[in-house]
């Protein structure tokens, strides 16, 4: 969700129902992104993000990229891996 002034955007990373318009009401605020900053551009609440991913939320390509940069996507993939039972 784009916020901010003209030429100085900030973005909210949110969980939204797929039937709601793009900038409509969101379910949960997961984090925010400020591309104008040199450091700490992105702040994500990992607990909330993992909760929604485990519930089946599908992140956009851009959000998945942000999750990868912060290491959150790797944690999610590792939590989904199940040990394979060896047959004798």
From Swiss-Prot:
It comes from the Bacteria. GO terms for biological process: translation. InterPro entries: Ribosomal_bS16, Ribosomal_bS16_dom_sf. Gene3D superfamilies: 3.30.1320.10. GO terms for cellular component: cytoplasm; small ribosomal subunit. Keywords: Ribonucleoprotein, Ribosomal protein. GO terms for molecular function: structural constituent of ribosome. It holds the Pfam family Ribosomal_S16. Belongs to the bacterial ribosomal protein bS16 family. This is Small ribosomal subunit protein bS16.
